[in-house]
């Protein structure tokens, strides 16, 4: 390649190749061969695999109805948040398999997976779900136990005498 001898030649070459950094990435619909969108969600130690397809609003978790799997109303509410906020309560069927962690972590993992799968199916919902904080992975995990301590931060009882 020929060497550029002056700054004017260099600027002419760099201006010719126009790089627009302000263009937002275009999100396209991601579907599998059966017309479903798939996403994984994580929370604490729980990992959820979530599939979304057009349907009547039925939610299945580990081959059980989600009302049967999650007995506590708070966990059901957490699970349904992204669908309710996106106003798609009765439009999609959700099938999820979740493993690891407790029920609270599993509900959070499914919520994260549903949010991601919704954005794959309908990219226009991304801004709404992003503002609600549903697409962000909650990175809080249990702090490890340290040696010389009873728990992560709790010390053994101290006696002066």
UniProtKB/Swiss-Prot annotation:
Q: Does the keyword Ribonucleoprotein apply?
A: yes
Q: Which residues form a coiled coil?
A: none
Assigned keywords, A-Z: Ribonucleoprotein, Ribosomal protein
Please list the GO terms describing molecular function.
RNA binding; structural constituent of ribosome
- Name the GO terms of the biological process aspect: translation
Q: What family is this? A: Belongs to the universal ribosomal protein uS9 family.
Q: What is this protein called?
A: Small ribosomal subunit protein uS9
- Organism this protein belongs to: Bartonella bacilliformis (strain ATCC 35685 / KC583 / Herrer 020/F12,63)
Q: Which lineage do the record's taxonomy fields give for this organism?
A: Bacteria, Pseudomonadati, Pseudomonadota, Alphaproteobacteria, Hyphomicrobiales
